[in-house]
Amino acid sequence: MAAKLVSLDMQARTALIKGLDTVADTVKITLGPKGRNVVLEKKFGAPVITNDGVTIAKEIDLEDPFENMGAQLVKEVASKTNDVAGDGTTTATVLAQALVHEGMKHVVAGANPMYVKRGIEKAVEKVVEELKKIAKPVETKQDIAHVAAISANNDEEIGNLIAEAMDKVGKDGVITVEESQGITTTLELVEGMQFDRGYLSAYMITDPERMEAVLEEPYILITDKKISAVSEILPILERVVQTGKPLVIIAEDVEGEALATLVVNKLRGVLQSLAVKAPGFGDRRKAMLQDIAILTGGQFISEETGIKLENVTLDMLGRAEKVRANKDKTTIIGGKGNKKDIEARIAQIKKQLEETDSEFDREKLQERLAKLAGGVAVIKVGAATEVELKEKKHRIEDALSATKAAVEEGIVPGGGVALIRTIKALDDIKVDNEDERIGVEIVRRSLDVPLKLIANNAGKEGSIIAEKVKEMDGPMGYDAARDRFVNMFDAGIVDPCKVTRSALQNAASIAALVLTTEGLVAEKPEKEKQTPPPPPEY
């Protein structure tokens, strides 16, 4: 078994703080509208330029194992905040550093770390309560544009793009970010329900110029069976022919004589039809087919439901205004399902979303939700070089997360003002002893640090700016981009409440751990064995 290194007391805490400071000092130069960028070396390809706290933190590993533990703890603050709120990682890192430094002075002076920790927790709880009171809901497209622009490093073009996308697909819609071949960033909208399966035969095309099959007012047969014998679908084909409407078949597969019959009838002008494979795999496929059935007001025909294809009647088929398919994709537009059924299905998927721990499942459920709720918007990111493209894509993804957080819990004044406005609420906290009061004071002194840093990065004296803001009321604060004092809501300088709240909660959680640490144990690095010289040649 490998030997271990052990460090205790002050020595342990000093090493932890040194590692923590290394990461925090690198991250904090990016805070605010005039924050700088950090360039990250990549083993392969061009370096990455970013001002995103979590991306920078994740790249840092230190040689000293004890210092590296401190660095890893800060990474945890940043990545946890990123997971919960999608932004605010730099603020979280800066707050963690401030809380640790303030707290360490008192712990070294003899305060009981466990009581200090309890004081910090009480103070954070009070601040979060106060933030929720200050927060106001996101109501207008303009609010969304402001939140997105600030998160994307004050890029108004990105802000407007995300506001436009959210306006089009609604709050439950899915917005995806993809790389574009050109140099401009554009927004594309996919209306209706789209899935990645195209027509099974090119003979089904109705628009040769665009290589698309477009069917107006079709009946839709939805099944998870493989259809190869024409006898299985003949009864329903005859019923649909009598209505004079086209037929869309969504099945595991349509092959052999069944497919041939559909093609021949299409060519002869007897029945316009379209066959596509069912989307997804396994249980996810069944869930998606049920979604389509609910959206179109049809029934999902399956062995499990006990309905045979031969017994399918017209009222079991779905309806839609239009179905469009090319070789890769099928889109169902204007499904004629019952609104209440669709809403119940949406509520069911939302419930599953709350309960799942898997990131992959969450993504897939979110996609299904969007397809039922109103569509998908795709932001295609363009840039002149690959380095710029990656940096821009990263900013858009950040802005998107922040915007979703803002919609969830509302917005608070940005630029560090919201945290300062909660300071007065700390006067009301009841503490059990002096050390708990110290914990509350530590939080009080740390709450103005983000604002000071924003001002410092803008070339101003942070302490002076912070004092001026404390003398003001409500949403009044400092606009570092234009060097003026303004109403933050009116100027559009806002942060999602969820981002500010998560940043403080995660910072306090790690700071409390560091303050109550007395010992560190790490692997002893093995000395590299010298390779023996090669044998002499004879």
Curated annotation (Swiss-Prot):
Subunit comment: Forms a cylinder of 14 subunits composed of two heptameric rings stacked back-to-back. Interacts with the co-chaperonin GroES.
Binding locations of ATP: 30-33, 87-91, 415, 479-481, 495
UniProt keyword terms in alphabetical order: ATP-binding, Chaperone, Cytoplasm, Isomerase, Nucleotide-binding
GO molecular function, one term: ATP-dependent protein folding chaperone
Name of this protein: Chaperonin GroEL
Enzyme Commission no: 5.6.1.7
Cellular component GO terms held in the UniProt record: GroEL-GroES complex
Organism: Dictyoglomus turgidum (strain DSM 6724 / Z-1310)
Function: Together with its co-chaperonin GroES, plays an essential role in assisting protein folding. The GroEL-GroES system forms a nano-cage that allows encapsulation of the non-native substrate proteins and provides a physical environment optimized to promote and accelerate protein folding.
